[in-house]
Amino acid sequence: MIAKVVVENAAYSFDIAFSYQIPPAMQEDIRPGCRVLIPFGKSNRARQGLVMSLEEGEESKLKPIRMLLDLKPLLNEEQLWLTEYLHKRVFCTYYEAMRAVIPSGLTMKVKVMCSLGEQQAMPPEPSAAQQRILEYLKEQKKPVYIGQLLMDLGLTKNAPALKELFRIGAVVFSEDVREKTADSKIVMVRLSDGYADLLQSGKIRMTQVRKKVISLLEESPSASLKEVCYYAGTTRQTLDKMEEAGIISYYGRQIFRSPYADRHQEERTDSGVTLESSQQMALDTLWHLWEKKEEGPYPTALLYGVTGSGKSQVYLKLIEQVREKGEGVIILVPEISLTPQTVELFGRRFGKKVAVLHSGLTMAERADEYKRIQQGLADVVVGTRSAVFAPLKKLGLIVIDEEQEGAYASQSAPRYHAREIAKVRCRYHKAMLLLASATPSIETFYQAQKGKIHLVTLSKRYLGNQLPKVQIVDMNQSYGFDISQELTAELADNLQSNQQSIILLNRRGYHTAVKCNSCGEVIKCPNCSVALTYHHANRRMMCHYCGYSRDLEERCPNCGSELMGFNGSGTQRIEDELGRIFPQAQILRMDVDTTMSKLAHEVKFQEFAEGKYQIMVGTQMVAKGLNFPNVTLVGVLNADQSIYSQDFRGCERAFSLLTQVVGRCGRGTLPGRALIQTTSPDHPVIRQAAMQDYDGFYRDEIKTRKLALYPPFCTLCQVGFSGENEEYVRYGAMWFAREFQKKASGEYKDLPIRMMNPCEPVIARVAGKYRYCIVIKCRMEERFSRLMWEMLRAFDSEKKHKEVHIWVDLNGNDL
């Protein structure tokens, strides 16, 4: 029996399953999905690996596995299948795929430790460098992390002296392996099995305190150490003596860390939600589809309804019915800012059965929530993109709320889209996929129009509420003013009426650029090809791509002039401007800068809901999914921002954002109104968003997509290249384009492919690395996948490309 193992930190050129011998001691325990420590390469350096399968085969010439890291598989059968799927489909390495499937807190850290070898192996005449190493290790008296040794002695990573000592056996290396996060446990106390016999024997001296402890544990078979000490009025020392005497015993019980633990209530039998007739019809349709899921291909449905139509109430009822059948549910939201409201909605109904997964949790909290799901303690999972991998054993339904959002697409390896993972998981489990949105993605709505997925519509707002009245404000004659007179007047009316308002400006910071008024020089980031944004709170210029910052320039670095000025406005400036106009108003700013601390979104939104603030200013995090009944006014500043972007999805994003933010007002008993400030008042997207006319927008957009051959009429495959040397990056992109063209016109000439020439993206340099990209219009199928893998492995095998990183993104957001 041999193990097929994939290794961590593999390049494309050798990211394959390698064969390893299974030592006899591991034969019974090793399984696919277990992690192992293996000798790899000519140096036999220890590396982590993942066992993908066990096969019959000749093992005498194979290297043996050094260590089994998991006593039971970390990945189950489905998770291994997902790892393989991600590897093939989104062109990532096996280990990148595995790290997406499980939370980072469950990954292993392997440290190479260094210690002295046998005395007889010591060199008779060590060099000065060798002597320093030997003396250092002798002083430590225990194995030392090799990185610490190199740092303390000022040695380079490939220190020749250390290598020679290792070669002759004077120094030995070992591996220290541990999980990144350990389980959190509390000490529990229980009566020992033979405690009654001990008491009857008369050999144990009984005191009043001991009697109290025994009486307590007879009533409650187990209790925490803290509880026993408190209720029995005793100390740890007394309990230790009882344990030594054999009366009680200690054991550890895992506790799950969660910031939501204190508000998890008991599960209720009913949500208390009453559906209107249109909602009930939608629910009946969806439930009929769910009941038919075993009969054929897994059902996919789009719940398409105007903002405020009660889509979440419909799928809450659907989830209740799915759980009654004993199956679990995953609910995805696009951003952390939407998680608290969703957790509150489902927590009230399902109590402790709700698990939460998002990047705002600590590594340990994510690991513990994952374990709760894995152990069946939670069967309703709420979270952002990565929650789609939640290890529910019996999955019946996945709901993707605001399914059109770009946040569902990962921007780093593996570059997957949560919607695509949801599809394959539903197919695997014969579960149902429900997509919900007031502004569905063009691709999803196209499938619904073609009958490939079921379309369920809610055309009116809940309780008969009217859609907001929208006014388009032409800002062409308002140069220098961020807030129009019309919006100022409406804000004043709202403050007078004790109603709340939301202002959207999808740009953070105070000013978007610092510019010299003499020579026109714009202060740019030294690491990225973008202008620095001025932040007034700390008087610093900051890069929103790499995090670089520096003090505000008093003089132009180009010409020395002191005539420095500012361009553009961000949320910080709007907050200040509103504060000057309405000094009595309490203003809340919601952007990345104000929500960095843990659970900041939840705290701030709760305070706004309680009426502590009258105006909320924010970026796109205030535009989607939020429900504040007292918000009756929405103002949109600089609405043209994304319409004229080079991305083919620019108009779609602009329409969605405008429609969604307008839909935040008038959700209670009071009517809503919105003002959209723009310099393009006659632009079709602005007009259609103002009328909440998704159908009209879709008809226009789908014509453009078809004419230009964009999704859904093709798959856009972007191949990206990055590196610190611009010439190497450019050469790598040119090489790939040339070799790809040869294959595409040769053995793969049957594939429908259109390749664009290599070019720099809009932002050509990020974090000190130059970037090039190639866009390929194709049809994603098995042969195209094979072609891409051949190209990636060929590129990675060329020594000339050693300094260039390559990646692939399918239908990504950066196109």
Report residues per predicted region.
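Generic structural signal for residues in well-ordered beta-strands
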Residues: 171, 248, 354, 472, ...
